[in-house]
Amino acid sequence: MGKRLGLAESAKRTPIYVEIPIRATMERVWELSQNPELHPRWDLRFSRIIPTDQDANGQLRFRYEFLLPLHTIKGTGTSLGHRHRSDGQATSVLKFDTADVLSPIGAGAGYWRYVPTADGLRFITGYNYQPGMGFLGQALDARLIRPALGWATAISFDRLRLWAESDLEPQDSRNLWFLDAGARAIGMVGAASLLRRVFSQRTTTGAKAGMTALGMSVALATWALPTHSSVPRAGRCLRTAPDARSARAPSALADLKAPRQHDGEGGEAVATRAENQTAASITSEPAGKY
């Protein structure tokens, strides 16, 4: 049924899947996710997205940046969106690549689906990539990099949801997340301090029992206290596709042009290693369904 896109070495790597329900209009979510100035405000995976050109078929070429304290990872990408499909959905497909040896992500591809529901929509992404950073990236991808990217994608989706539903600016939800995390960290440090005193001080058995109970109670309350609804959480997202259709990339991904980069200093623009193969292992819809 579906067509698999990908390199042989990527076949064993599980694509990242994230889905969240959003109680907002399709137009609202489309604008917040497709506008290159708004997209990086909620998506932790990008610091800047700079469109460079668009062809006659609507395929958009862009550059992206991810700012680190001492380095900026740069890459290129192509994307194509379909706002109005015959089935009522909207979709967007993407291919990306980077020549940055410090990037943990190499060439890859993915998609977004906007699936209408009775009270809003399901916002879905699936993507896969070749690990970057050479042997180190290969070694760390499955256990560290890929789970971290999945978490970053999920918490970003919840930031988008809060923005679309409640007009809570992404920087404000980020600050609330840090406040929540800080408060929980203080609680755990306090609990650890109480438990440490139990073993470091000479006190009666009753006092030790009381301090132990207090320390354990503080730790449990800190861990179990529900997160406020305004604090973004990755746990509000699905991380496994509920059905086969959701996990399929739109068929337009197969025909999307690969991003192009400059081959060295002053070199000609050449197709990247993602040309005609995307480093993804994503099942796509049959042709003709976008």
Enumerate the language-model features and the residues they cover.
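A short, structured loop/turn motif at beta-sheet edges
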Residues: 23-27, 53-57, 82-90, 113-122
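A conserved amphipathic terminal alpha-helix motif
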Residues: 128-175, 182
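Hydrophobic pocket/interface hotspot
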Residues: 28-33, 39, 60-64, 94, ...
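Hydrophobic ligand-binding cavity/cleft-lining segments
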Residues: 1-61, 184-199, 213, 217-290
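Short structured motifs
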Residues: 15-16, 47-49, 63, 95-98, ...
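Beta-strand/loop substructures that line and gate deep hydrophobic ligand-binding cavities in soluble
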Residues: 6-10, 68-76, 83, 95-151, ...
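Membrane-interfacial hairpin junctions
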Residues: 197-209
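Surface-exposed, charged secondary-structure patches
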Residues: 55, 65-70
